[in-house]
Every structure is written in C-alpha cells, then in structure tokens.
Amino acid sequence: MEEEVKDIWHVYSDGTRADIPFDTTEDKVYTWNSVAISAETAGVKVLVLTINDTHLHCLTKGDTERVAHFKKVLRQRLANRFTRIHFVCNPVRTRKEAKAKFMYVYRNCLDFYKKLPGEYPWGSGNIYFSEHNSNPADHRIGDYSLREQYRMFRTRMKLPEGWMVDTYGRILSDSFIDYVSVEQLFVSVRSFIAFLYVRREDEVALKQEIHRNYLESRSIQDLRRIGNEYCVQACGKTLVKVNVRVRLAIAATMIREGIAGRSASLAKALLLKPDDLTLLI
C-alpha cells in the first residue's frame, strides 16, 4: 500500500491559453514575487515553482483553508496586472504522487528550455541537496525602506527581513521555497535523481491528467463568462441573444483552444442541450 501524504497541493494555471500573460522579465518577476508573497500571507510553504510565458505551476504545503487563501490572494495579485487567470488546486494523495508531481513542475521548462531544469532562470533552481551561497550582488529585504519595499513588491505586508532579492528585485528561491521538506520527501540525492529522469510516456500521461483536471475544474459560471466574451467579440451579442448555431460555434472554439472539454457543464454554460455538442465533429 502506498504511503499517504497530507496537505500537499498542485496549484497551476492553464498552459494552453492563446495569450502570453507572463511575457516580459518584469511580468515574470511580478508573478514570481506574487507567489512568494501570497504564500507568506496565507502561511503556506512552496515546495517548487516554475513560471513559463503562458502559465505557472507550483507545489505547495498547507492545510485546505490556508491553500484556498493562498490561491485567492495570488489570483487577486495577478488580476491587478494581467487578465483573469484561472487556477486549479488539486490535492496530492501519496508520497509517490508527490514526487512525480514535484518533478513535473521542476521539469516543466523542458518543452522549450535546452539546459537542465535547475538552470532555468524562472524555476526553483539548484537549491535541493545543495549548498546555498549568497551572491554579493543580492540584497536583504530588510535593507530596503518600507517605501522601497512597497514600490518593489506592491504589498503593505511586512516581509521577512532576511529574505534575499537579486538585481531584478526578484525574491530568491531559497528565501521562500521549502527545500528542506523536499529533501525529506525524497530522502536521498539518489532518489531525487531517479525521479528526475521520467519516461516520456509517463510524462505525457501525467500532462494529460493535469490538463483534464484543469478542464473539469472550471465552473459553469466561469465557462459562461468566457463564452459571453467570445460571443460579444464574434457578433456583438451575448449568448442569450444568439441562436444555437452561434452557440455551437462558440463551443467549438472553446474546445479547440483547450478552454473546455465536451461536457454537460460546457453545454449548460453556453445554454445548449448536452446532445447539441454531438453535432460538433
């Protein structure tokens, strides 16, 4: 029987969205710091974090209430800078799953990054089973005035004075990422390396599972909001004012762009009958 784990969660946004919310270095710094600040606000530990141009993934540690608070604060902070971003928060049940999900997040850059994941600048870095040496160019948050901190981090919250930031103003990984819990999870360097090398078919299956969970997590209200936005863009009217043919076209677009799957929830959100979706080829 597999060993169970508690209070570990996979939090992520949609990797198939058409736009690029985290495009620039400034966008990534803001998003990175937002994860750190949201976790500190909610009393949640971050185990691993990766930010790509289109989405982010992290593994967090905390009880249900704290992780829900983390998700809410993070969504609010990102909404101040980007378009609305939907997050999924799935519990991790076993130690084996925790290791696999950790490596999925850690390796997430490999679809487009040609070096080892520990070298990816917008990932956790080489902080696990390694020494943590500060760079002379880095600074303690406590060295900045409260006014400077607000300008850099856009929060009134008092952040830990010992946290370190780099020349971009980004909070360093080993200041807020709980590498100790990760090392306890894997136990040894040998185990960490073994999980780092994932079979391609296993990674594809996990990616499909994660995307399926994302699609299933969307509420009817969320799908209807998106459907109305597409409908207004297409014909200047909301869903309630257009015919079934137009609604089906909107459904086809949302399915094609990976926003939703063929489901009763999508049909209900777009004011269709479940059988109507069978008309889509």
Which ranges hold each PLM region?
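Short Pro-Cys-Gly-centered "Cys-loop" motif that presents a nucleophilic cysteine in a tight turn
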Residues: 1-51, 63-281
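Short beta-strand->loop micro-motif that forms the acidic, two-metal-ion catalytic signature
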Residues: 55-63
